[in-house]
């Protein structure tokens, strides 16, 4: 007898999705946004069910995501941004707090928060992860959101 397996799919066209986007490093972030929107639309989500909400930077994304989750209007939140390491400890603070804050929002409100915030050592790595050699992490985050919406709906139906 096979083991029972529950897993999400990339088909959740009825969902509403909020993209919470940090504007800092916009030359990279806009590629993440394009990748996320394209992935959602290719998997059946209407553009009318996608809202882009812009925050100043990655550090502010968790608070905006929290407010979005509180509204209860969206099935998933996709956080997009880019934190590029510099010569000071600033990178660790911003990347760490953004990560912790987004995880907290997801757990507190039971809403999937897909992590598409690049935390990289160089501009070259950011460019690679926003649509060139290493794929588009915005598109990957959107697919994670779709899968989580599908998975949670199955778990809630049980």
From Swiss-Prot:
HAMAP family: Lumazine_synth. Catalyzes the formation of 6,7-dimethyl-8-ribityllumazine by condensation of 5-amino-6-(D-ribitylamino)uracil with 3,4-dihydroxy-2-butanone 4-phosphate. This is the penultimate step in the biosynthesis of riboflavin. One of its GO terms (molecular function) is 6,7-dimethyl-8-ribityllumazine synthase activity. This is 6,7-dimethyl-8-ribityllumazine synthase. (2S)-2-hydroxy-3-oxobutyl phosphate binds at residues 87-88, 129. It comes from the Bacteria. One of its GO terms (biological process) is riboflavin biosynthetic process. Belongs to the DMRL synthase family. 5-amino-6-(D-ribitylamino)uracil binds at residues 24, 58-60, 82-84, 115. Keywords: Riboflavin biosynthesis, Transferase. GO terms for cellular component: cytosol; riboflavin synthase complex. It is an enzyme of class 2 (transferase). The active site is at 90 (proton donor). Its EC number is 2.5.1.78.
């Amino acid at each position: 007898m096979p083991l029972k397996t529950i897993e999400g799919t990339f088909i959740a066209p009825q969902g509403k999705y909020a993209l919470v986007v940090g504007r800092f490093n916009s030359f990279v972030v806009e590629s993440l946004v394009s990748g996320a929107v394209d992935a959602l639309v290719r998997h059946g989500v209407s553009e009318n069910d996608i809202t882009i909400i812009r925050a100043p930077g990655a550090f502010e994304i968790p608070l905006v995501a929290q407010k979005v989750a509180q509204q209860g209007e969206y099935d998933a939140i996709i956080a997009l941004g880019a934190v590029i390491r510099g010569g000071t400890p600033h990178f660790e603070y911003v990347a760490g707090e953004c990560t912790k804050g987004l995880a907290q929002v997801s757990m507190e409100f039971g809403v999937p928060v897909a992590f598409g915030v690049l935390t990289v050592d160089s501009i070259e790595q950011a460019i690679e992860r926003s649509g060139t050699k290493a794929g588009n992490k915005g598109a990957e985050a959107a697919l994670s959101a779709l899968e989580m919406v599908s998975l949670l709906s199955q778990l809630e139906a049980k």
